[in-house]
């Protein structure tokens, strides 16, 4: 077993092809999908450092990283840290089969060596501890601190029953549910159905302004400057206009 890697400073054709192909066989959330990442990249000026990790020439992981300057400090972080509720690597679904902790840490050390001349701090925030049925090595292998906890929706009944319960809720609750659901790869189809229920609630389209106001409140609670919300709004409006969500 041999690990190798390649670093992309932009989402060029090769990078996009690898990423697009990977989405069919890899585990990731909505925030690591290529169409969302591309919107983020278009609206920020951070330096991209997308790392593709190979095991015997087979892609097993994509690390969507960027270097952002905070005042005079260059920070390595996940792409979209300010906007995404979940910031994770993108791992192949058979990652466990190809994972060797020692090899992974060695290759990570080499990657960091390449970044070092322009890097002052590594800050990986909003990570999932477990991705599908395997542990996130960036949480498992390094010392981490819990800043806060969030709880995702757990569907304990058939979707039709759940949908009926949504009809009984007011529009505000429906928007909150929809906003949460669209974030997750596994719940894409469900999120579209929730979107239909919102339209049935006397609304012609998804109320982006309403969602943004709620997101701004989240950003405020995280002490993130309000100026970020305007970029967030632009990103999601573009996605909705293009019918990607």
Predicted regions and their residues:
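Short beta-strand-to-loop capping motifs
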Residues: 91-94, 153-157
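Divalent metal-dependent hydrolysis catalytic cores, especially in the metallo-beta-lactamase
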Residues: 118-127
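A conserved beta-strand-loop-helix scaffold within acyl/acetyltransferase catalytic domains
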Residues: 2-56, 60-76, 126-150, 158, ...
